[in-house]
Amino acid sequence: MPKDCLLVVDSGYSHTTVTPVYKGQPIQRAIRRLDVGGKLLTNYLKEIVSMRQYNMVDETYIMNEVKEAVCFVSNDFKSDMERTWKANRKREEAQSVVVDYVLPDPNAHKTGFMRPHDPLLHAKKKKGALSGLSAEVLSEDVLVLGNERFTVPELLFTPSDIGMQQAGIPDMILQSLSVLPPGLHAAFLANVLVVGGNSCITGFMQRL
């Protein structure tokens, strides 16, 4: 029976769907869709960063690179939020959640990259205490990313965070199974196929 039952979770660019497949045929009445995909996550990150740091509204490609480099799905959202709040006071806490993303510099032929957050360096640059810093460091444009790293992909699981009246992925799965015979639930849950680019986000599979 399990080989006849397949539950496909597809989280791609435009949306996320849950589709039960029985003997090779999708069960149409049980398909569930969430209008959250990679595009929305990138746009949401872009909006947050533009409000808090640099204006990145027109930099969709760069912000997609940032998302793929730094974002993760939290398996303990409350704890990660608390660690982020403490980051300004305790360096060891900051290093566990907060990271720097050095924006690409096309003039110097440098691509963007993530590195551990250095609060002392950030404070120096913010205060204009630039003596002793290399020309390379001075020329860098850096995004400091803390709770953005996990609040953005959290929309896949809690879309109500941005006011969407739709179920997140776990509830979608339950809703999908609810219209199927109870005797088949275990068979579908024993054979889950997860596809789509968002499934590559660190922590996605563990959370699911």
What are these regions (language model features)?
Residues 1-208:
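C-terminal region/appendage detector
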